[in-house]
Amino acid sequence: MRWTPEYVLDGADQVYCRTTAAARHEYRKARYLADCGVARQWKTEDEQLRVDFVGVGGELCVRKCLDLPERWDDRDTEGRHDLTYQGKRIDVKATTNAVPWLIVRKTALPVDAYVLVNYHGGRFRICGWQTERMVKRDENTWKWEYAYTLKEQVLRCITELREWAGKDPPGADIRPWDRPDAHREVRSHRFG
């Protein structure tokens, strides 16, 4: 059984998440209004704020798990990734589903890794993580055509994220025979 840390936010963290979620919601609403000329409303105001609260809470829990400071100045302002850990761009995906899935749109901007967090019963549970290269594979489009979907069981343990980010250079998760320069590596091993 792999370790999946759980967090319950205290009062100060909850207030922080609510205010940050409200600020993000207002920013997104104003930006969309400026870009399109209309306010987008897929859900009620309360539902949209809850989605933002769960997202901010998930990011905060991942920061706590990785021993990162609880500040947001390393967050990408355009929404491409949620935090930077040892030079790696990480996007936190939070869900409230009883059975969590990592769902990434095919049009998502590039990051180095995705972390899945589930909010259920007042607790945030970090389900696992996976590299972008492993997420964006054709066999992961079996559920929806517009997104990549991965079950929680195929995600890596969050403790491995520390090792991956700390030791491996970008692209280290690529198998040697998938690299563009694989023929050079083989030649160098054969002929010394």
List the predicted regions and their residue ranges.
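Nucleic-acid endonuclease domains
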Residues: M1-Q86, K93-G192
